[in-house]
């Protein structure tokens, strides 16, 4: 089956992101495909390259990046939700006159259209 995930919780402070990541790993291990992850609301904070967890903590941003690199999972970040929460790529930072960009490598800013496309193209859309 083809799955798409939506993550609405931050990398830290809730179980949303870690549960979604563990679910994605298990799906892949079972032979399913994970087409994309859409980060929405507080979930966009998973895409910040400025997180610095302690060495004995899970680095959720890095985990998502590895999922992207190893399995080609698209990491889509809602642009409106991201900008509200201080997450920006270089292009948006330049357009808005922001001092810096902090979107982690492998993530891409997209609109809600990416979520709609995922809902249409996948067999299951699972929200965390």
UniProtKB/Swiss-Prot annotation:
One annotated GO biological process: tRNA wobble position uridine thiolation
Chain segments annotated as transmembrane: none
Keywords associated with the record: Cytoplasm, Transferase, tRNA processing
The keyword Transferase is annotated on this UniProt entry: yes
EC number(s) reported in the record: 2.8.1.-
SUPFAM superfamilies in UniProt: DsrEFH-like (SSF75169)
Pfam families, A to Z: DsrE (PF02635)
InterPro entries per UniProt: DsrEFH-like (IPR027396), Sulphur_relay_DsrE/F-like (IPR003787), Sulphur_relay_TusD/DsrE (IPR017463)
Enzyme class: transferase
Principal place of residence: cytoplasm
Residues of the active site: 78 (cysteine persulfide intermediate)
Molecular function terms, GO-annotated: sulfur carrier activity; sulfurtransferase activity
Hydrolase listed as a keyword: no
GO-annotated cellular components: sulfurtransferase complex
Entries under PANTHER family matching the protein: PROTEIN YCHN, SULFURTRANSFERASE TUSD
Biological function: Part of a sulfur-relay system required for 2-thiolation of 5-methylaminomethyl-2-thiouridine (mnm(5)s(2)U) at tRNA wobble positions. Accepts sulfur from TusA and transfers it in turn to TusE.
Description of how the protein assembles with itself and partners: Heterohexamer, formed by a dimer of trimers. The hexameric TusBCD complex contains 2 copies each of TusB, TusC and TusD. The TusBCD complex interacts with TusE.
Recorded family membership: Belongs to the DsrE/TusD family.
Protein name: Sulfurtransferase TusD
Gene name as annotated: tusD
